[in-house]
Amino acid sequence: MTLLNPYFGKFGGMYVPQILMPALLELEKNFVEAQKDINFHKTFFNLLKNYAGRPTPLTLCNNLTKGTKTRIYLKREDLLHGGAHKTNQVLGQAILAIRMKKNEIIAETGAGQHGVATAIACALLNLKCRIYMGIKDIKRQHPNVFRMKLMGAEVIPVKNGSGTLKDACNEALRDWSNSYKNSHYMIGTAAGPHPYPTIVREFQKIIGEETKQQILEQETKLPNAIIACVGGGSNAIGIFSNFINDKEVSLIGVEPGGKGIKTGQHGAPLKHGRTGIFFGMKSHLMQDQEGQIQESWSISAGLDFPSVGPEHAWLNSINRAQYVSITDQEALDTFQLLCKKEGIIPALESSHALAYALKLMNLSPKKEQIFVVNLSGRGDKDIFTVHDILKKTGKRI
C-alpha cells in the first residue's frame, strides 16, 4: 500500500518486478518522512544556495526580440553548478539516499548532464557512483563522459538496443534489482515507477518558484506562457508546477520533432504516441502497430527518449498543458541564433523550447506578450555535435 497516490489520472503506477516493490516502498516512506523534516529541508536548500548557486537569474533577451513587442525571458538553469537543472534534484536524492543509509548510487544518462550532476553529488557526499550510458550517447557526448570520470564515477557503456537513453534506463533498473539493499537508483527525470515522478518534481519545483517571484519583480504580472523542452520532462515539470493553478498562463512543452514527424524519426510520444507500459510506468509511448517500442530520434541526446513522464501525460489529457514539436534543424538554427544574438550557448535540448518561443513571437510580432523559456542547460556539451553537422553540410558558422 502506497502512502502517496501513485497515479496522475490514469498515468503513472508501479509496473516493476515484484523484487523491486520493497525498494520503491522504502524510498516512498523515507521521502514522505524527509518532506516533514525541517533539517532535511535546511540541508537541501543550503546545498542549492551555497554549492549549486541558486537562485539562477531570469534574463531578458533584448536582441532576439528587437523589432517586436514580445519579451522573452530565459530562466538560466545553464548557470547552475554542473551546467543544467539536473543538479537540483540530484542533490535532493543524494541526501535522501544517505538518510536511507545507501552508499552506492546507480544512474542512467543520455546527454550526460544527469550523469555529471550525479557524479558531482557523489563526489561531494562521498558516495560510490556507477552510471549507465548508451554507446551512441557516449560518442556524441564525450566531454560529459570525461567530466563524470574526472569526478570518480564509473561510466558503464550500454550496447543493447539503439545504445541510447532508454537502453541505459533498462540496464540501470536491472542493476538496481540486484543491488537495492545497498544502492539507490537515482532516476534522472520525472518518469519511471512511483514515487520517482513525484520525488523529481518536488526537488525541481524550485525552478518554478523562483521564476514566479522573479517575473513578478521584473514585470509585475505573470507571463503569457511558460515554455520548456520535454524528453522525460523534469525541467518542464519543475518550471510548470508553480503555474498549474494560474489558468491565464499557457504551459507549453516542446518535444523533439527530429527529422520531421512524418518521417517517423522523432521523439514526440505525447502527440504522436499511444498509452503503454514502459520504464515501470503507464504513459504515452512510441509504439508500432504490434505494440513494440519504436526507436526515438533527436539531435539532442537528452530528448532522445520514446516515452514521457506521467504527469505530462496527465496535463496533456486534461488540456492544462499544450505539447508541440520542433525539428532538429529548427533547434540547430536557434542554437546558433542565441549564441550570436545574446552571447549564450544553450543546450540543444533547451534550443527546442526557445525555437518554439521564437515561432510564437514571429506569428504575432506586434502583439504585447511575455514568454519565459526554461534554458535547462548550457551547450558546451553540444559544440562538437553542432560543429560536425555544420561541417558535413558545408555551412559556415
UniProtKB/Swiss-Prot annotation:
Source domain of life: Bacteria
Family statement drawn from the similarity comment of this UniProt entry: Belongs to the TrpB family.
Catalytic activity of the protein: (1S,2R)-1-C-(indol-3-yl)glycerol 3-phosphate + L-serine = D-glyceraldehyde 3-phosphate + L-tryptophan + H2O
Pathway in which this enzyme or protein is active: Amino-acid biosynthesis; L-tryptophan biosynthesis; L-tryptophan from chorismate: step 5/5
Enzyme Commission (EC) number: 4.2.1.20
Cofactors: pyridoxal 5'-phosphate
Statement: the UniProt record of this protein carries the keyword Aminoacyl-tRNA synthetase: no
Organism: Buchnera aphidicola subsp. Diuraphis noxia
Modified residues (N6-(pyridoxal phosphate)lysine): 86
UniProt entry keywords in alphabetical sequence: Amino-acid biosynthesis, Aromatic amino acid biosynthesis, Lyase, Pyridoxal phosphate, Tryptophan biosynthesis
Biological function: The beta subunit is responsible for the synthesis of L-tryptophan from indole and L-serine.
InterPro entries tied to this protein: Trp_synth_b_CS, Trp_synth_beta, Trp_synth_beta/beta-like, TrpB-like_PALP, TrpB-like_PALP_sf
Quaternary structure note: Tetramer of two alpha and two beta chains.
Disulfide bridge partners, by residue number: none
Encoding gene, per UniProt annotation: trpB
Cellular component, GO, one term: cytoplasm
Protein name: Tryptophan synthase beta chain
One Gene Ontology term of the molecular function aspect: tryptophan synthase activity
Short name of one Pfam family: PALP
